Regions:
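Short, conserved sequence motifs used for protein processing/export or organelle targeting and
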Residues: 23, 122, 127-283
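Local sequence-structure signature of Cys/Sec-based thiol-disulfide redox active-site neighborhoods
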Residues: 85-129
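Intrinsically disordered, low-complexity Pro/Gly/Ser/Thr-rich segments with frequent PxxP/GP/PP motifs
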Residues: 25-55
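Surface-exposed loop/edge segments in extracytoplasmic proteins
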Residues: 29-35, 73, 164-167, 246-247
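Asparagine-centered strand-capping/turn motif at beta-strand->loop junctions
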Residues: 9-14, 222-226
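Extracellular Ig-like/FN3 beta-sandwich strand-entry sites
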Residues: 2, 44, 56-60
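Short coil/turn motif common to extracellular beta-sandwich-like domains
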Residues: 2-6, 213-215
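Terminal connector regions
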Residues: 55-85
Length: 283
């Protein structure tokens, strides 16, 4: 990785400068030297130094300016800490609207397209949890639940367990992550936001057949992308299940307000399905 710094020299005063020189060094090592010669009063020069960044370390940049008729050397110092690596911002989103939302197929279609898209498929993790009442998610705060709708509405999504939701509109019937109005575009903006930790999570199911119970064993490896002096890192595990209300139901019904609509690509097939669509499992 490289870093650019620009020095601008303005000559002011009654006389110009003789044999002006600008030196650029990084971490005490010479990178560039410019012989500017004689500079007249009012003259301006801008010079850019390009330096390699040492990953994981503090890099100190120094500009030193001298001239024969200048009494002292003028120095400008700056520093930057280079990332040891550039981690991928992985995005977890939860679709949290209530059961039988007739516009949910827009969200389902968008999720499916994003999971097929090379720019999203390795860093986008959607969960369709369909919750609309307190108590279904022990990790959620009262504020989190207070933002949920009381009845079936257009599908809502909570990115990264925030208390401000996002959602889908008619524009999302055409998958286009370059369109600033779409859900996919907004999620792409989130993924592009720098992150400074890389977390690898591994887990396995442990089933106890004798009493029909299941537990999960998880481990996490955390790597900071830059030195965090005295920082204490805490990792929280959130176990989610793609729950579409099948427990205790003979079948699950998906209302489908898009049935029979004229949409490019048939919204992945949803426009060709009836309203309601019965016995549907969506994961």
């Amino acid at each position: 990785d490289t870093y650019e710094l620009t020095a601008t020299i303005d000559v002011v005063g009654a006389e110009g400068l003789k044999n002006a020189q600008l030196i650029f060094d990084v971490n005490g090592e010479l990178v560039d030297m410019w012989e500017l010669g004689n500079m007249a009063c009012g003259q301006t020069a801008s010079l850019t130094g390009v330096a390699n960044i040492v990953k994981g370390k503090k890099n100190v940049f120094t500009f030193r300016f001298t001239a024969d008729n200048q009494a002292w050397e003028q120095t400008a110092v700056a520093s930057v800490t280079g990332l040891a690596f550039i981690p991928t911002h992985r995005l977890f989103v939860e679709e949290t609207t209530s059961l039988h939302c007739g516009n949910c197929p827009i969200g389902m279609y968008t999720f499916e397209k994003m999971l097929e898209d090379p720019q999203f498929k390795d860093c986008f993790f959607p969960s369709s949890v369909h919750i609309a009442a307190m108590g279904y998610d022990p990790m959620a705060t009262d504020l989190y639940y207070s933002k949920l709708p009381d009845s079936s509405v257009a599908p809502l999504v909570y990115p990264e367990r925030e208390t401000v939701y996002d959602g889908f509109k008619a524009v999302d019937m055409i998958y286009d992550p370059t369109n600033e109005e779409t859900f996919a575009y907004r999620m792409a903006r989130r993924i592009a936001t720098p992150t400074y930790l890389d977390v690898d999570v591994a887990g396995k199911w442990i089933v106890y057949d004798e009493d029909d119970t299941t537990s999960v064993q998880c481990t996490a490896t955390v790597r900071p992308a830059m030195t965090l002096h005295g920082a204490n890192l805490r990792v929280a595990f959130i176990l989610t299940e793609n729950n579409v209300g099948l427990d205790g139901n003979i079948y699950w019904m998906q209302s489908n307000y898009l049935s029979g609509k004229q949409v490019e690509g048939n919204l992945g097939g949803w426009t060709q399905l009836p309203d309601p669509t019965l016995n549907l499992r969506f994961h």
